[in-house]
Amino acid sequence: RNDSLLLDQWYDKMVISEILPVPYIGEPFTGYDQINLSFPELENIILTQKPDWKAALETTQGIYMITDTLNGKRYVGSAYGSNGIWSRWRDYVDSQGHGGNTELSNVIKRTVNYARMNFQFTMLEAINLKVEEDIVIRREQHWKTVLLTQNKEYGYNLN
């Protein structure tokens, strides 16, 4: 009941500036080099199966990075196979942020919504689905080395 009283105080000052033809479900896909998503943004894209994002992420494999915005540590991972980045990032959403990774699992156990509050997802390198898995894994190792994510001071990669 208190909520409606609060709305009553502001109702006459509110302006409807636009009525969208469909409910807002996030930003459109604008390119692999533009991906920089908070966990809630990624979760929204995956759970609503946003068609433009799904089409783009299902048809590419690649190297991605998860940044812990609380402490600056990073995790570099790769996605390869028939459903590409989409499938791998869906694993993170389904697992509340760890994607089956031991170190990330230990991190998110600290706080109930740790990943939701602190994880940021970005693409480092998009790779055609026709490229062989071993090449994707070599590129992942390159990024781990460059970004020092195997050093506990800077990252969450254990291998």
Question: What positions do the PLM features span?
Answer:
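Short, hydrophobic/aromatic alpha-helical segments in well-folded domains
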Residues: 62-63, 88, 139
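Mixed-charge (Asp/Glu-Lys/Arg
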Residues: 105-114, 134, 150, 154, ...
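GIY-YIG nuclease catalytic motif and its immediate N-terminal context
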Residues: 1-80
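Generic alpha-helical secondary structure signal
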Residues: 40, 87, 102, 134-137
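Conserved short loop/helix modules at catalytic or binding sites
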Residues: 82-129
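Domain-level recognition of nuclease-like catalytic cores that cleave nucleotide substrates
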Residues: 130-149
